[in-house]
Swiss-Prot record:
One of its GO terms (biological process) is tRNA modification. Keywords: ATP-binding, Magnesium, Nucleotide-binding, Transferase, tRNA processing. This is tRNA dimethylallyltransferase. GO terms for molecular function: ATP binding; tRNA dimethylallyltransferase activity. Its EC number is 2.5.1.75. It comes from Thiobacillus denitrificans (strain ATCC 25259 / T1).
Length: 313
């Protein structure tokens, strides 16, 4: 127990390609951690290459909770994540171990800390109307509409992020209040003493190089083949949340003949950079986070020292 009388937990947050998984596996080898994935794409079965899902050898050494828990034609929400994560955190703590939550889906981290109790459930009729509106005007037009109603939320979303734009507009219409204002409330605090580590690069150009190299490695490892297999084995369309993930939507467009391989690579890298930028925007204003340079040679030792102090190890 901490000095607060609460069990300890650690958040390891960071943008894509910042080395979160490698650091988490290293920390797990030194401390009594169990890893919980905080990633809206890693929940899907069969989506391995394009999500940089840890390979079998890594998972044998360091198992991860909340991987491969949904089919790619299913949805997964922040509310579902909170339920799943809280249940696993409680079980891990009961085993005398410490939850280490690792990922880059910042909304999930925030929802876990602050709760989503006041947000309404999805409204099928309203969502259908929004989707019909988007089909006529395009999601960027709805993003602009959201910017007028909830600028804080719109600033964090890409203009074509149909799932999240739709949800944010839905919340405004159902409650009369922007989602950002409701997320600022704390209806149910997380009952843990949480050390929050944020991986932020000192050199954005270096992170961009990593992103490009990683996307090239995904293409080499068979990203297009993976998406082709998913299309063959599941009833999918390009608007489903799983297929809106970075890399997957570009591969889908390639398989549809809308873009060539060069454009797939160019658009995929650009979209990944944009994702990293949004993640860093969250992290730079994240209250209570301890920032670590993900490019530093002493990253592991600095992170380990902070964890040791937090756990009293």
């Amino acid at each position: 127990m901490s000095t607060l009388g609460l069990p300890p937990a650690v958040f390891l947050m960071g943008p894509t390609a910042s080395g979160k998984t490698a650091l988490a596996v290293s920390l797990r080898s030194r401390f009594p951690f169990e890893i919980i994935s905080v990633d809206s794409a890693l929940v899907y079965r069969g989506m391995d290459v394009g999500t940089a899902k840890p390979d079998a050898a890594t998972l044998a050494r360091a198992p991860h909770h909340l991987l491969d828990i949904r089919e790619p034609n299913e949805t997964y929400s922040a509310a579902a994540f909170c339920d799943d994560a809280r249940a696993r955190m409680a079980a891990i703590t009961a085993r005398g171990r410490v939850p280490l939550l690792v990922g880059g889906t910042m909304l999930y981290f925030r929802a876990l800390l602050q709760g989503l109790d006041d947000l309404p459930r999805a409204d099928a009729a309203l969502r259908k109307r929004l989707e019909q509106d988007a089909a006529e005007r395009g999601w960027p037009a709805l993003h602009a509409e959201l910017a007028a109603l909830d600028p804080a939320t719109a600033a964090r979303l890409a203009p074509n992020d149909s799932q999240r734009i739709g949800r944010a507009l839905e919340i405004v219409e159902l409650t009369g209040r922007p989602m950002s204002a409701q997320l600022a409330q704390t209806p149910r605090a997380l009952p843990y003493d949480v050390l929050q580590l944020a991986l932020v690069p000192s050199d954005r150009a270096a992170l961009h190089r990593r992103i490009g190299e990683r996307f090239d490695a995904m293409l080499e490892a068979g990203l297009v083949d993976e998406v082709e297999m998913l299309r063959r084995n599941h009833v999918l369309d390009s608007t489903m949340p799983a297929m809106r993930a970075v890399g997957y939507r570009q591969a889908w467009a390639y398989l549809d003949g809308d873009i060539d391989l060069e454009a797939l690579r160019e658009q995929g890298v650009a979209a990944t950079r944009q994702l990293a930028k949004r993640q860093l925007t969250w992290l730079r204003s994240w209250p209570g986070a301890v920032t670590l340079d993900c490019l530093a040679d002493d990253l592991e030792s600095r992170a380990a020292a902070l964890v040791a102090a937090h756990l009293g190890a």
